[in-house]
């Protein structure tokens, strides 16, 4: 496999080296190799343009969504990525901040109660989907004495649509289309829906409508006329069956 230059964006340099090494090991064990593997945080933020231009793969790391969002704004990452042609991979908070508007789901104690906590922030605009990762791990969690999803996130979903992703699922986008691979759910207008079941129901309804429309334009297939020999053979068969019944 071709070796690539990879560049990983981190917001807390205390963890940069640790997470970067773990990420590098995961890719290596999956058959990917990199010529260079560099991180970007506040220590080398001035080198951002050079690092991004050299990279072929950009990984948006995890962390605290609002904190990461501030860092991305500070280094004007949206503009840096807009003028480049890179493979971009987002993990956890990185995938969330990849949307046009990120839903910064309350995570730390006190955030859901803080009137100054901003739950919707302008982000990178890589995807249109608002992602909520790790759903299988956090769907039953409580925060500030309330159910994280049922009493906080569901309310915030009014007029919006959040796509939950279990670990192992991912969203793929090419600039035109976005496709979710794996089991996921949509939280919208305080309701939870299974994405696949919704897609299957919609597809079935669409196919039925197409069939009805086609019947209006497609002429029925005429029955094939029988030859004289076929008619005689058919008559003989019926007569034979009739005589057989009389004998019995």
Predicted regions and their residues:
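Short, well-ordered alpha-helix to beta-strand connector turns
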Residues: 55, 84-85, 127
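Short, active-site-adjacent cap segments at secondary-structure transitions
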Residues: 66, 95-98, 170-172
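Catalytic nucleophile loop
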Residues: 59, 82-101
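Short glycine-rich anion-binding loops that position phosphate/pyrophosphate groups of nucleotides
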Residues: 63-65, 93-94, 136
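Glycine/threonine-rich flexible loop motifs
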Residues: 65-74
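N-terminal beta1-alpha1 cap of cysteine-dependent amidohydrolase-like domains
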Residues: 1-57
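P-loop/Walker A phosphate-binding loop and immediately adjacent motor/lid segment at beta-alpha junctions
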Residues: 75-87, 158-161
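C-terminal and late-domain segments of enzyme folds
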Residues: 1-2, 8-10, 14-21, 104, ...
């Amino acid at each position: 496999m071709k070796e690539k230059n990879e560049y990983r964006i981190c917001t807390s340099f205390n963890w940069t080296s640790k997470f970067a090494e773990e990420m590098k090991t995961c890719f290596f064990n999956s058959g990917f190799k990199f010529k260079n593997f560099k991180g970007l945080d506040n220590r080398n933020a001035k080198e951002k343009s050079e690092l991004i231009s050299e990279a072929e793969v950009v990984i948006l790391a995890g962390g605290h969504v609002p904190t990461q969002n501030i860092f991305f704004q500070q280094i004007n990452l949206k503009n840096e990525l807009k003028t480049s042609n890179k493979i971009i991979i987002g993990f956890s908070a990185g995938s969330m901040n990849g949307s046009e508007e990120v839903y910064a789901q309350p995570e730390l104690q006190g955030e859901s109660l803080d009137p100054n906590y901003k739950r919707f922030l302008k982000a990178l605009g890589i995807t249109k989907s608002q992602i909520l990762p790790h759903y299988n791990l956090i769907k039953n969690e409580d925060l500030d004495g309330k159910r994280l999803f049922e009493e906080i996130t569901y309310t915030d979903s009014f007029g919006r649509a959040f796509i939950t992703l279990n670990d192992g699922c991912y969203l793929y986008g090419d600039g035109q289309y976005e496709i979710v691979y794996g089991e996921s759910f949509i939280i919208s207008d305080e309701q939870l829906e299974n994405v696949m079941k919704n897609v299957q129901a919609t597809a079935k309804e669409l196919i039925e409508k197409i069939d009805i429309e086609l019947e209006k334009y497609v002429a029925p297939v005429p029955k094939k006329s029988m030859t004289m020999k076929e008619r005689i053979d058919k008559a003989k068969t019926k007569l034979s069956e009739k005589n057989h019944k009389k004998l019995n």
